[in-house]
Amino acid sequence: MSELDQLRQEAEQLKSQIREARKSANDTTLATVASNLEPIGRIQMRTRRTLRGHLAKIYAMHWASDSRNLVSASQDGKLIVWDSYTTNKVHAIPLRSSWVMTCAYAPSGSFVACGGLDNICSIYSLKTREGNVRVSRELPGHTGYLSCCRFLDDNQIVTSSGDMTCALWDIETGQQCTAFTGHTGDVMSLSLSPDFRTFISGACDASAKLWDIRDGMCKQTFPGHESDINAVAFFPSGNAFATGSDDATCRLFDIRADQELAMYSHDNIICGITSVAFSKSGRLLFAGYDDFNCNVWDSMRQERAGVLAGHDNRVSCLGVTEDGMAVCTGSWDSFLKIWN
């Protein structure tokens, strides 16, 4: 038996010890605890606004912290900032590369960012003196596509990439401050914790990881999915998070219990999940699917509570406003829809 096989065996034994330790700490299940909760009933939401203007598939969207404006990125090579109340386009930004996969709105509302197959995170300033929008910084350094980016503030942004890493950047200097390494597959998504001290990443190695932004270390790894994780989203309390995967399930993981609490799936749902987001209370989990629908799950009772049907193609992205009053879905049908 080679040394490598011995080490593999040892690693497997350690993994099963961890599984046993998790089991012994698991004194009840979420289903048991949630069984005496009132059912929330059928969630029926209507399309309040349709944002038309993109000419190709929409790949990403992100709400501004004012819960009114949002930014969307499309294969038509445009980044559009919308006013969701009036459906007006506040800015239409032509991109240098049309192969965009992610976009983000800075908490201050002064900047947006995007990136994709160009491997670069581009930062655009919305509040220039001249009134025009321009690239204020380009952040090259990833050796694979940019899959997700989120601002910490106007000078720091976290990115995830197809090069199996995440990174923290100083926007002013354009330098990478921290590299977060440990995934063994493309990192597809990230979600910042409510206190901005940690973030979760989901990757094609079918695991999610919790990272400390300040020291760059991976604090926890969460296995369980059977295929790529495409989307992750923190629970509003910051103590749990949801994942969406190509294995046709969403799952809820508890950070303090260090394990999976719930799985959201249905025999009729056989396609992958592209995006996930929680309602303000965390009771509802919105998930966008390849079959053109957005399912609404009761996160506690693990039941389907509703469906947002209105797109004619894959729902590629979704987001809930900070005030919790609206959901936006973006699709390959080139439209964004606002629901409540």
Curated annotation (Swiss-Prot):
It comes from the Eukaryota. InterPro entries: G-protein_beta_WD-40_rep, Gprotein_B, Guanine_nucleotide-bd_bsu, WD40/YVTN_repeat-like_dom_sf, WD40_repeat_CS, WD40_repeat_dom_sf, WD40_rpt. Gene3D superfamilies: YVTN repeat-like/Quinoprotein amine dehydrogenase. GO terms for cellular component: cytoplasm; heterotrimeric G-protein complex. The keyword Transmembrane helix does not apply. The keyword Transmembrane helix does not apply. WD repeats lie at residues 53-83, 95-125, 141-170, 182-212, 224-254, 268-298, 310-340. Keywords: Cell cycle, Cell division, Mitosis, Repeat, Transducer, WD repeat. CDD domains: WD40. PROSITE patterns: WD_REPEATS_1, WD_REPEATS_2, WD_REPEATS_REGION. GO terms for molecular function: signaling receptor complex adaptor activity. GO terms for biological process: cell division; embryo development ending in birth or egg hatching; establishment of mitotic spindle orientation; G protein-coupled receptor signaling pathway; negative regulation of locomotion; regulation of egg-laying behavior. Disruption phenotype: RNAi-mediated knockdown in one-cell embryo results in hyperactive nuclear and spindle movements from early prophase to metaphase characterized by vigorous rocking of nuclear/centrosome complex and its failure to center properly. Normal centrosome alignment during metaphase. Belongs to the WD repeat G protein beta family. Guanine nucleotide-binding proteins (G proteins) are involved as a modulator or transducer in various transmembrane signaling systems. The beta and gamma chains are required for the GTPase activity, for replacement of GDP by GTP, and for G protein-effector interaction. In the early embryo, controls the magnitude of the forces acting on centrosomes but is not required for generating asymmetric forces. G proteins are composed of 3 units, alpha, beta and gamma. Interacts with G protein gamma subunits gpc-1 and gpc-2 and with egl-10 and eat-16. Interacts with goa-1 (in GDP-bound form). This is Guanine nucleotide-binding protein subunit beta-1.
